[in-house]
Structures are given as structure tokens and as C-alpha cells.
């Protein structure tokens, strides 16, 4: 997420960021502003529908529009399904899938107005099940199906949908 923020900033974008850790967000916001980048940070738990709505509302309030939404919040897991507590899968779906659904639901009308882009960061695990990643793979398959369906539903409206599936990366997903 942080790397994406800096890449968009480097290209002149105004940045709205949402995450649970407000202190980290504010550090990034301060750094961006010191570089002349207009930035907004909003504490957001993507498992909470109202947090996602608030993030979108504050973004539109501040910038007047949304050109790109990057759904990047995610958590992972490692355990064989037979050893797994079902709450782990529920939590994975809440963050990885429902977080994408909630943020997209509230941002989509604004993205359609700008004929902008809707992005979902999934994983190679969203194409091929990985051992010990049952819940994680399921959540990423769900995001891929959701976004691909939105692409088809909005073909004639100018919506660009990108589903990015990187391999293993250096990130905070396990933290």
C-alpha cells in the first residue's frame, strides 16, 4: 500500500489513504505534504461498512472526485484447512473480500462519473489454490470474481477494472 501511494504521488496524484493504523497513515501524509503532494489520511477498518463509506465521503469532500480506487487491504494465513479454526476464514473474507466490496460500493458512483479505474490487489493465490492458504486463496478468488463481474456489468460505462495478482512481495500483510 505504501509503495503504491508513493508511486501515485510521484505521478502527480492527490492521495486519499485509509488504514487501521492512523499513526502510520499520518506519518505518510506528513511526508507527502512535505513533498508538495495533497494527501488525506482517514482511519479505516475495511471490515466496517461505515468506515468505508466515511473514507469515500471524506475523499470526495476534500478532492471533489475519485479517479482511482485501489483495494489493497489484506491479511493472510498459513494452516492446513483441517487444522484451521473457521473464524480465521471468516476474518480473511471480512478483510480481503468484504473490505473490497464495501469500499467499491461507496466509491463506484464517483469512479463511474470520472470514467476512472477500479483496482483490486489479489495474489497468484487468487488463480491457483496454495497449500496451507485455503482461506486466503478463497478470499482472493472471491475478489477476482467480484471485480471481473463489475467489469462486465460496466463495460459500456467507461469503467476500467484492473485485477493485479503479484507473486510474493515484501509487504506488511503478515503483520
Where are these regions (language model features)?
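SDR active-site lid
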Residues: 156-175
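Conserved glycine-rich Rossmann-like NAD(P)H-binding loop of the short-chain dehydrogenase/reductase
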Residues: 11-27
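Active-site helix of classical SDR
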Residues: 104, 139
Amino acid at each position: 500500500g505504501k509503495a503504491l501511494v508513493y508511486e501515485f504521488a510521484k505521478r502527480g496524484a492527490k492521495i486519499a489513504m485509509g488504514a487501521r493504523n492512523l499513526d502510520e497513515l499520518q506519518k505518510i501524509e506528513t511526508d507527502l505534504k512535505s513533498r508538495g503532494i495533497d494527501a488525506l489520511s482517514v482511519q479505516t477498518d475495511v471490515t466496517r461498512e461505515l468506515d468505508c463509506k466515511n473514507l469515500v465521503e471524506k475523499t470526495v469532500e476534500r478532492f471533489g472526485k475519485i479517479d482511482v480506487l485501489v483495494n489493497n487491504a489484506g491479511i493472510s494465513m498459513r494452516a492446513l484447512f483441517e487444522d484451521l479454526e473457521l473464524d480465521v476464514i471468516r476474518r480473511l473474507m471480512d478483510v480481503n473480500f468484504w473490505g473490497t466490496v464495501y469500499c467499491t460500493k461507496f466509491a463506484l458512483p464517483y469512479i463511474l462519473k470520472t470514467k476512472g479505474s477500479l483496482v483490486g490487489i489479489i495474489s497468484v493465490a487468487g488463480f491457483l489454490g496454495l497449500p496451507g492458504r485455503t482461506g486466503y486463496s478463497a478470499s482472493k478468488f472471491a475478489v477476482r470474481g467480484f471485480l471481473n463481474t463489475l467489469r462486465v456489468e460496466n463495460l459500456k460505462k467507461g469503467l476500467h477494472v484492473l485485477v493485479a495478482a503479484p507473486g510474493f512481495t515484501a509487504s506488511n500483510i503478515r503483520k
